[in-house]
Design a protein with these regions (language model features):
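Outer-membrane beta-barrel porins/channels
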Residues: 3-24, 28, 32, 50, ...
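N-terminal periplasmic accessory domains that precede
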Residues: 35-47
Length: 274
């Protein structure tokens, strides 16, 4: 999409959580003791145990590495404080001149250092905020920005409904690569999850990029479903309609995305490693 190509720091759109990645790449409503989920919604930090360390790694594409780390601290019964880092290293790339002749190589990387705070506002309702400092290096060029994520989560434990609203990457650049300041990858999301009492199944639906009114409605939608084999083991999959649409080759009735948009995963939570 043109809007994404015109924004900076698009690594912030990538899921830190392997769980969220398995469910279509976007999920802001899962209530679990998983610190990586609070990168998607700061209100979910309240579900993370005290003194929890989180680490994640993804080989995003050839030569590119994406990593996340966090530490969570409970502040009494209602508040939670966490610190986190998101880091993307794009590796070494060719540097060419105007005639496409290679004249050398350069490295590119981006990092966001974050502080996360969540607080129980009312019964079943939690609010959260993430403050982040972002810096990017492309060869000899550097830019910096500040941003904020705002999140709300309402969770009804008896019926296992979870509903969230998140506004991500509100802010702007404080230092541009050159003279022109870039735009932040602002994203407003709404999501819902439901766990069924009679079946060990949880389903999720998340609407993303709601500030982009020119998208077809279906391209805002991410769907996910999980089978909860136990309190510690899940197997799930998801479908990202927008990704499937963008990866479709051709515009005929027989055009195919060749499986793009589908995602799958599984997870196990080992108590002794918490």
């Amino acid at each position: 999409r043109a809007q994404e190509s015109q924004t900076e720091y698009n690594f912030l759109r990538l899921p830190v959580s392997a769980h969220a990645a398995a469910l279509g790449g976007e999920n802001i409503t899962i209530i679990e003791d998983d610190p990586s989920l609070m990168f998607s919604n700061p209100a979910l930090a309240s579900s993370v145990s005290d003194k929890t360390v989180g680490l994640s790694y993804m080989n995003y594409m050839r030569g590119a590495h994406y990593m996340g780390a966090s530490y969570t601290k409970a502040l009494g019964e209602k508040a939670t404080l966490a610190g986190g880092v998101q880091y993307m290293n794009y590796g070494k790339m060719k540097e060419v001149d105007a005639n496409n002749v290679q004249i050398g190589t350069f490295n590119a990387s981006e990092i966001a250092v974050e502080g996360i705070f969540s607080y129980e506002l009312a019964r079943n309702l939690v609010g959260g905020i993430t403050a982040k400092f972002i810096t990017s290096y492309i060869g000899n060029y550097n830019s910096m920005a500040v941003g904020v994520d705002l999140g709300l989560n309402w969770f009804e434990p008896e019926r296992q409904w979870s509903v969230s609203l998140v506004a991500k990457n509100l802010g702007g650049q404080i230092k541009a690569y050159e003279e022109e300041y870039g735009k932040m990858p602002i994203d407003v999301q709404v999501g819902v999850s439901k766990t069924f009492a009679a079946l060990p199944v949880r389903v999720s639906a998340t609407l993303v990029d709601l500030t982009h009114y020119d998208y077809r409605f279906i391209n805002h939608l991410n769907l996910g479903a999980e089978v909860l084999l136990s309190e510690s083991i899940w197997v799930g999959g998801g479908y990202n309609f927008r990704k499937a649409d963008e990866m479709t080759i051709g515009k005929t009735e027989n055009a195919s995305a060749h499986g793009a948009g589908f995602s799958f995963g599984a997870g196990i939570n080992l108590e002794q490693f918490k």
